[in-house]
Design a protein with these regions (language model features):
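Short Cys/His-rich Zn2+-coordinating modules
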Residues: 12-22
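Short acidic-glycine-tyrosine-enriched beta hairpin
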Residues: 163-183
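Short metal-coordination and nucleic-acid-contact micro-motifs, chiefly zinc-binding Cys/His arrays
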Residues: 30
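Short beta-strand His + acidic residue motifs that chelate non-heme Fe in jelly-roll/DSBH
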Residues: 41, 143-146, 164, 181-187
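Conserved short histidine dyad/triad with adjacent acidic residue
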Residues: 116-148, 178-181
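Ligand-binding loop in jelly-roll beta-barrel domains
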Residues: 180-202
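Glycine- and acidic-residue-biased ligand/ion/polar-headgroup-sensing regions
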Residues: 138-141, 147-163
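Positively biased amphipathic helices and basic secretion/translocation or surface-docking motifs
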Residues: 1-7, 21-23, 33-35, 46-107
Length: 218
């Protein structure tokens, strides 16, 4: 069962379409996994739609104009446009993984590999809320212990990872900040959506040796 969710403010901003793109993707992925938050977003969207209808209520003398316009639109012949769907799977280390709908049309960089951890940066025009990537932890992989100079969001897509604070399954919306030092690891392998708004800060090992690893994560 999913135990980690966006807060109500994030869900409301998502329903109102006011989030930066990278955070919109994160919430959309979670909502695809989480029926509870999907229902909450549907309720929020319905409330927003009702408020817009009330604000834009048509005056009685203009109602026939709206009806005429609607009738004209409905009478137009429908046109079927073929849509080229991208392959909803990705491959890494000889394994195939299905992607959530929100990520299937997002361009990505080639995979970069450092040891048993890989990263593919998402190519987003809007990076105002940070850099978004796909991260893959191979079976037995562990990220060196670190804290954060900003916000770190990790959302498992396939597989499970854990740290000192718990275990996280596909759909969990895991937010961490500078108050948290942790060492994510996966026993059987885990593909994640990751969002960082600043580089991580390693708390163990030699910083110089880990600089390249930090660049890979960010």
């Amino acid at each position: 069962m999913i135990n980690f969710h966006p807060d109500n403010a994030l869900l409301a901003a998502y329903a109102a379409d006011t989030l930066p793109l990278s955070m919109t993707l994160a919430v959309a992925i979670h909502v695809e996994f989480c029926p509870t938050c999907a229902r909450r977003v549907a309720d929020l969207e319905r409330q927003l739609a009702e408020s817009v209808l009330i604000a834009d209520k048509i005056f009685p003398e203009e109602e026939h104009l709206f009806d005429d316009m609607l009738s004209y639109i409905l009478e137009q012949p429908s046109v079927t446009v073929p849509v080229q769907m991208e392959e909803p799977k990705i491959e890494i280390q000889g394994q195939s993984f299905w992607l959530p709908r929100a990520l299937r049309h997002i361009s990505r960089q080639n995979w970069q590999q450092m040891g048993n951890i890989g990263r593919s940066r998402l190519l987003l025009d809007d990076q105002s809320s940070g850099r978004a990537s796909l991260m893959y932890l191979s079976a037995g992989a562990a990220v060196p212990q670190h804290t954060h100079r900003g916000m770190e969001l990790t959302l498992p897509l396939t597989g499970v990872f854990r740290d000192e604070l718990g275990e996280y399954i596909p759909g969990d919306f895991v937010l961490r900040d500078a108050k948290v030092a942790h060492q994510p690891q996966s026993r059987d392998g885990c593909l994640c959506f990751a969002l960082l708004d600043a580089p991580v800060q390693f708390t163990q090992g030699l910083p110089r040796l880990l600089n390249g690893f930090g660049d890979l994560l960010y």
